[in-house]
């Protein structure tokens, strides 16, 4: 089962894209981490996800879910490099899971790397066609990228006039 958080973070330029937490069958730590992340309790979610990964009791199904949850928590904390590395590990374990690409795209969004974000959102759509979370995140990213380009264009015009 996948739980969806309506918004992960608020940025100065736009409402944040939605995350996709993973709830693992039969693993309390993975599920507790997902629940903490749903409530934007980043530190608690990261701690529980790390504890799950260190426990040695995860099934092969639970490992990618725990990595995904850790990725979300690290993103919420603003630790984008470590979050990106963790998302890549999750994708390596389960390369056809749309939510992993969604969450990696969110990191790119927060880093204002909108083309990379869109690439990952579109990749996620190949695994979950028509998904509402992905459509919303793509729309948000396109609008935010357009506003950023307009700002840069306006700043360039101001500099030229000076």
Task: Please annotate each region the language model reported.
Residues 26, 60, 64, 98-99, ...:
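Helix-start (N-cap) detector for alpha-helical repeat units in TPR-like alpha-solenoids
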Residues 55-59, 93, 127:
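Structural marker of alpha-solenoid helical repeat scaffolds
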Residues 38-39, 76, 110, 140-148:
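Register position in tetratricopeptide repeats
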Residues 23, 125-162:
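Terminal, low-structured helical/coil segments at or just beyond the last alpha-helical repeat
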């Amino acid at each position: 089962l996948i739980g969806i958080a309506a918004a992960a973070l608020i940025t100065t330029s736009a409402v944040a894209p939605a995350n996709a937490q993973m709830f693992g069958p039969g693993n309390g730590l993975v599920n507790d981490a997902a629940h903490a992340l749903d409530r934007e309790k980043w530190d608690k979610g990261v701690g529980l996800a790390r504890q799950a990964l260190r426990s040695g009791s995860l099934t092969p199904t639970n490992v990618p879910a725990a990595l995904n949850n850790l990725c979300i928590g690290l993103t919420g904390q603003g630790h984008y490099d470590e979050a990106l590395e963790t998302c890549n590990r999750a994708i390596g374990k389960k390369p056809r899971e749309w939510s992993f690409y969604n969450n990696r795209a969110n990191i790119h969004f927060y880093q204002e790397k909108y083309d990379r974000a869109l690439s990952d959102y579109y990749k996620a759509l190949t695994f979950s066609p028509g998904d509402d979370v992905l459509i919303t995140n793509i729309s948000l990213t396109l609008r935010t990228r357009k506003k950023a380009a307009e700002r840069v264009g306006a700043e360039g015009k101001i500099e030229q006039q000076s």
